[in-house]
Amino acid sequence: VLTKMRNREIDILVGTQMVTKGHDLPEVTLVGVIQADAALALPDFRAAERTFQLLVQVAGRAGRGALPGKVLLQTFQPEHFVIRRAIRHDVDGFLDEELVNRRELGYPPFSHLALIALDDPEEGRLQVEAMRLADVARAFTPAVEVLGPTAAPLARWKGRYRWRFLLRAKDRGKLREALVAVHRASALAHRDTRVALDIDPSHLL
């Protein structure tokens, strides 16, 4: 499809965010993004960063040749700082504003995180195990903050229920101590309960 686009055999390309990843299509002069703010609603502290990155990337697909380009964004939040900064391609302004938000909320780079994710075919058993392991981690408060446990945004996947909780600490050593304790305690979990520890998780979903 991309070859046809480059050869001018097609004029309109409809795709996912994959079309933003490094493709050089110099004849493209108009790019449209539907629901450009949708990802901002995801329960992940990196949602703003990823949305800004995507919008800047997709804007870079238009006007790469001799002709000028235009980008149209559909958004319900035109005054959101991510949308405003992306429209202006204001990387420094976005970083300044995002860092203020993260500092206020205590998210990286102003803290260290670890995600403990559990899944099990039996939801009741899973919930009990998630609470048990979270209680193990709470023995390390106040140095380590425990957020959750709660059902994951995608609460069931391939016949298995999913729960998770988050550990947050300013001291990486204290976080490591809590993780070691949780890891040891997880050895007592039911054989059908899977427990995964993710330090500095790339996503929280």
What does each model-identified segment do?
Residues 54:
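Glycine-rich S-adenosyl-L-methionine
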Residues 1-13, 18-42, 48, 57-205:
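Accessory helical-bundle/CTD segments and flexible terminal tails appended to RecA-like ATPase motors
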